[in-house]
């Protein structure tokens, strides 16, 4: 939805030239306290973070937070559904933020890695319906050794909050040298987890969203609409689908009264009026035989027509490919640009331990659930066995084959949908690399750096990635888990009442949208 990224998904920069503009630390006077009643709302939690940080930038009284207005853990959330997390996640967040701020002396400035950790702690407190958390991408300077190595060693034990963010070096396409690029590539291979990532830009102030498919200037966010292209039967069918998606996306672009956000967010959003018309099911191969350039032209024409009716600007950038983790599950397609993960695999989904489905599965089907590694006290992971449809393209294609598909779609779908801006949108893709393939993939990425902004890479076997979203399994393991899954009786999972009222959800708030992020 148009604005789900405002509260749940966030791209941010801790590049040195951005962190440098933050004020020097001026600690509050701890001899003088000021009570702050935290409001029971998203805005109330955000205000609590803001007032704490400001007290360390501009001095004044020490903030004493009052959490008495926050609903207790397990209380119903009427608008978004699910259950309230209670005040504890916010309390933990504020304590950790204060710890970082207190570690500085008056007159000192925060370092990029300290700002990065603060954002990660904030993300840990962001719950949607008591279940999901924020997904982050952190862009940092090429010369920042602390950020480059921030996920080295046993970081998940000493700094588990860093698991909330994918970290990427921001590189200027026209300035980066091949020597630096290939040295960085070797570090990525050695990490065993595909980090740090690489984000190529034509402007040092531009960024992206966590899945890297949208090119964003500062104070901008995504507006995504998706098309199922796995079963298109003709060029006419294809163009009719993308025309409808462009119409919907342009309608969403008109919702710019953000209330809580600073006015600059509205000005930037209205100026570019971004849409992101995405395709999923590309791995079926059907759409690759059709004229994507002509379809991108249809997207732009429909966007322009609808924008004129709404009296808004036509979109500066229109076409993209997002990862499609949730929609592909709903539609039964391969995700985005990707082939199916494997013939048999396990798909992981996170769930709050205060949810009825967790209690039921834990009691009757414990083999399907496990504790979430980073938050075992309140979050669990459900493993769902999956089997690809017969005749599917599987992940056993070479990474170069996938990269060439990325390049083709970038050239024939995304570039033709670009009107203006320093960077074009991007194909979001995760490239799985076997041990002997790293040099060839690195060379391809260098030679083709004009054809992508950022790509995610992982060792083919998942490397050191803990509880990855997808994991290969044998046919025997699949059959074993399916036997358990067949016995799951969802009718026994009883909610005493359901106070969910989506009519209370403003049109572009996207509160019912779920973030799938490992």
Predicted ranges, named:
Residues 1, 42-53, 126, 130-133, ...:
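Conserved phosphate/anionic-ligand binding catalytic regions in large, soluble enzymes, centered on
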Residues 33-37, 41-53, 88-125, 184-187, ...:
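Alpha/propeptide regions of enzymes that mature by internal proteolysis
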Residues 2-7:
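Short, small-residue-biased leader/transition segments that mark boundaries at the very start
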Residues 188-191, 197-261, 271, 323, ...:
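Catalytic alpha/beta core of large soluble enzyme barrels
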Residues 62-64, 104-117, 126-138, 254-270, ...:
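Flexible, glycine/charged-enriched surface loops at secondary-structure junctions
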Residues 32-34, 66, 71-109, 237, ...:
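A structural-propensity feature for long, helix-poor, extended segments
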Residues 500-518:
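Short acidic, low-complexity intrinsically disordered linear motifs used
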Residues 131-175, 256-266, 279-323:
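Internal maturation/activation junctions in enzymes
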């Amino acid at each position: 939805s148009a604005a789900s990224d405002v509260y749940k998904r966030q791209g941010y920069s801790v590049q040195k030239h951005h962190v440098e503009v933050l004020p020097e630390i001026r600690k509050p006077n701890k001899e003088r306290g000021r009570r702050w009643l935290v409001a029971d709302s998203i805005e109330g939690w955000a205000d609590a973070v803001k007032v704490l940080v400001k007290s360390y930038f501009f001095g004044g009284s020490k903030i004493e937070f009052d959490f008495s207005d926050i609903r207790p853990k397990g209380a119903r959330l009427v608008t978004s559904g699910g259950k309230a997390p209670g005040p504890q996640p916010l309390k933990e967040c504020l304590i950790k933020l204060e710890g970082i701020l207190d570690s500085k002396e008056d007159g000192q400035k925060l370092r990029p890695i300290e700002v990065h950790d603060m954002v990660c702690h904030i993300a840990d407190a962001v719950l949607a319906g008591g279940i999901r958390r924020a997904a982050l991408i952190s862009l940092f300077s090429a010369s920042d050794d602390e950020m480059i190595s921030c996920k080295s060693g046993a970081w998940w034990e000493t700094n588990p909050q860093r698991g909330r963010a994918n970290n990427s070096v921001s590189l200027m396409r026209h300035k980066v040298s091949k020597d630096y690029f290939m040295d960085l590539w070797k570090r990525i291979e050695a990490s065993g987890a595909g980090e740090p990532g690489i984000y190529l830009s034509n402007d040092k102030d531009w960024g992206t969203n966590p899945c890297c498919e949208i090119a964003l200037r500062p104070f901008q966010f995504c507006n995504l609409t998706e098309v199922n292209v796995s079963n298109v039967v003709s060029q006419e069918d294809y163009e009719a689908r993308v025309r409808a998606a462009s119409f919907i996306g342009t309608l969403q672009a008109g919702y710019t009264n953000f209330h809580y956000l600073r006015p600059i967010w509205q000005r930037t959003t209205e100026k570019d009026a971004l849409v992101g018309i995405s395709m999923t099911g590309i791995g079926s191969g059907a759409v690759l035989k059709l004229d994507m350039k002509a379809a991108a032209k249809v997207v732009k024409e429909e966007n322009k027509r609808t924008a004129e009716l709404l009296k808004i600007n036509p979109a500066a950038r229109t076409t993209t490919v997002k990862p499609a983790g949730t929609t592909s599950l709903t539609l039964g397609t391969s995700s985005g640009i990707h082939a199916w993960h494997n013939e048999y695999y396990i798909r992981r989904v996170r769930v709050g331990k205060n949810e009825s489905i967790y209690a039921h599965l834990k009691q009757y089907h414990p083999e399907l659930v496990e504790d979430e590694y980073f938050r075992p006290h309140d979050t669990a992971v459900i493993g769902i066995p999956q089997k690809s449809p017969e005749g599917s393209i599987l992940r056993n294609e070479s990474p170069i084959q996938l990269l060439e598909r990325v390049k083709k779609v970038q050239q024939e779908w995304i570039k033709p949908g670009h009107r203006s801006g320093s960077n074009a949108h991007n194909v979001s893709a995760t490239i799985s690399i076997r041990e002997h393939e790293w040099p060839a993939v690195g060379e391809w990425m260098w030679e083709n750096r004009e054809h992508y902004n950022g790509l995610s890479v992982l060792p083919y076997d998942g490397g050191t990635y803990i509880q990855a979203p997808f994991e290969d399994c044998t046919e025997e393991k699949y059959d074993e888990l399916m036997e358990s899954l067949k016995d799951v009786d969802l009718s026994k999972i009883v909610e005493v009442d359901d106070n969910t009222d989506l009519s209370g959800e403003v049109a572009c708030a996207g509160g019912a949208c779920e973030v799938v992020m490992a």
